[in-house]
From Swiss-Prot:
Function (record text): Plays a key role in the replacement of histones to protamine in the elongating spermatids of mammals. In condensing spermatids, loaded onto the nucleosomes, where it promotes the recruitment and processing of protamines, which are responsible for histone eviction. The histone H2AB1-H2BC1/TH2B dimer is required for loading of TNP1 onto chromatin.
Gene that specifies this protein: Tnp1
Keyword Protease found: no
Recorded phenotype for the gene knockout or disruption: Reduced fertility in males. Testis weights and sperm production are normal but sperm motility is severely reduced. A significant proportion of Prm2 remains unprocessed. Male mice lacking both Tnp1 and Tnp2 are completely infertile, but protamine alone are capable of histone eviction. Chromatin in mature spermatozoa shows defects in density.
Region: Disordered, residue numbers: 1-55
Organism in which the protein naturally occurs: Mus musculus
Top-level taxon: Eukaryota
Protein name: Spermatid nuclear transition protein 1
Length: 55
């Protein structure tokens, strides 16, 4: 149970914190980065959504 819980928090934390942080760090080429981020973000959202539904 502990491992499952840890994994869930880690996944959520990683997806929510990692993307915005990267964008903020790379303020210079925000426009260029945004395009790739949009694709990755969409995929991540879908994955997390499916993961949540399964749980």
């Amino acid at each position: 149970m502990s491992t499952s819980r840890k994994l869930k928090t880690h996944g959520m934390r990683r997806g929510k914190n990692r993307a915005p942080h990267k964008g903020v760090k790379r303020g210079g080429s925000k426009r260029k980065y945004r395009k790739s981020v949009l694709k990755s973000r969409k995929r991540g959202d879908d994955a997390s959504r499916n993961y949540r539904s399964h749980l």
